[in-house]
């Protein structure tokens, strides 16, 4: 397996940015879409619970409908080649006895993981469904980070979107999937202009070495 050298890794980390406008003429190939979907599917999660569902929107009319309920992100979404809707599972679906959890793992893995997960729910969350919901959202955002970095490795661009009306977008999607619980949107495509220079805190302010 070949890995990127130090300079290439540094370049990619610096070039990744939140793209605010995409090349509206750029269309993803089926290979690119499949690769993005696989990047999402292979995202890590605590206990390998994978408490998410990803909806890839490439239909222009549907994307336009969603964009209309995204406030100041409307033009950016319309210019994107695709829009990923990141949805979370319900807390009840992550209970150890749920159909989802009982069918998620191979039997040899399940007998080890389910008891440990059940113990964690009691010790860490005191069986609070609200805390379990927060845990699920944490896992979804881990996936979001992987997706955006993975897309950058493909030479493509992305923007995480929290500014939208989840009820309105949910109503649009309900015609196709059952009652989605939307965490965020990710606009995907090819940048139309070069990114501005990345601005970050200094290493001294951001990192403590012990």
Curated annotation (Swiss-Prot):
It holds the Pfam family Nitroreductase. It is an enzyme of class 1 (oxidoreductase). NADP(+) binds at residues 150-155. Its EC number is 1.-.-.-. It comes from the Bacteria. Gene3D superfamilies: NADH Oxidase (3.40.109.10). Keywords: NADP, Oxidoreductase. Reduction of a variety of nitroaromatic compounds using NADPH as source of reducing equivalents; two electrons are transferred. This is Oxygen-insensitive NADPH nitroreductase. It comes from Helicobacter pylori (strain J99 / ATCC 700824) (Campylobacter pylori J99).
